[in-house]
């Protein structure tokens, strides 16, 4: 990302915060059922099974009285069979077809870090690593969309269902095998991830 692009995005969020009619801080706590991951570069598919929980803090800046459009920034942490931290930002769209349901879609750019223990070495496709397990570190840069379905919404607390879809166009993996750190160089790496979840949202 060049400097002009970076400062352009920073200016966009600055003006959105300055001129937005409403700013909402939203806390989210939830459970992710699974992660479906597909690596385009080496044609591999993974189904992680139950992943664990997530806690996030989001700031939404909406324009107008109806709160249909705005921008957001989000900091999230995941824990379970892995640990992760992520910063995401982008536009936010919101619609409430009735009093029971509110739909919120948030396309985003993201920067993330993930750590997983005891990964199967064979999944890396390198026989030189031998067999057994390894600790994996991953740095991600990508984009995606999170869709929230708020149910029985109230002013402060709302249960919700959601889907997170992301594409990592930059991904660097490191594995720790018997105390030695190996760098995995994926050419043209592209990682697709689909994650359904359930949780509760708290508006401050």
Annotated model-derived regions:
Residues 47-49, 101, 135-137, 188-190:
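A generic structural micro-feature
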Residues 58-159:
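Gram-negative (and chloroplast) outer-membrane scaffold detector with strong preference
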Residues 54, 84-86, 195:
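Short hydrophobic/aromatic beta-strand or adjacent loop that forms the aromatic wall/cage
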Residues 32-36, 76-82, 110-118, 166-172, ...:
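Structural signature of outer-membrane beta-barrel domains
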Residues 37-46, 83-89, 116-127, 172-181:
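Outer-membrane beta-barrel translocator domains and adjoining extracellular loop/strand segments
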Residues 1-24, 204:
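Cleavable N-terminal export/targeting peptides
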Residues 45, 146-204:
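Predominantly the C-terminal beta-signal and adjacent terminal strand-loop region
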């Amino acid at each position: 990302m060049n400097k002009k692009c970076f400062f352009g995005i920073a200016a966009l969020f600055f003006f959105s915060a300055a001129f937005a009619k409403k700013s909402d801080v939203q806390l989210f706590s939830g459970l992710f059922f699974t992660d479906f991951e597909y690596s385009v570069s080496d044609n591999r598919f993974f189904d992680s099974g139950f992943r664990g929980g997530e806690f996030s803090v989001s700031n939404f800046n909406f324009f107008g009285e109806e709160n249909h459009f705005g921008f957001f920034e989000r900091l999230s942490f995941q824990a379970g069979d892995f640990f992760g931290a992520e910063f995401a930002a982008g536009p936010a769209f919101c619609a409430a077809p009735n009093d029971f349901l509110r739909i919120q879609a948030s396309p985003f750019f993201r920067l993330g870090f993930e750590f997983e223990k005891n990964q199967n070495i064979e999944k890396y496709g390198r026989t030189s690593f031998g067999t057994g397990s390894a600790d994996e570190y991953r740095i991600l840069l990508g984009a995606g969309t999170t869709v929230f379905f708020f149910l029985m919404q109230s002013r402060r607390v709302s249960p919700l269902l959601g889907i997170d879809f992301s594409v990592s166009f930059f991904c660097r993996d490191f594995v720790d095998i018997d105390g030695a750190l190996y760098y995995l160089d994926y050419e043209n790496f592209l990682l697709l991830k689909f994650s359904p979840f359930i949780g509760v949202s708290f508006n401050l």
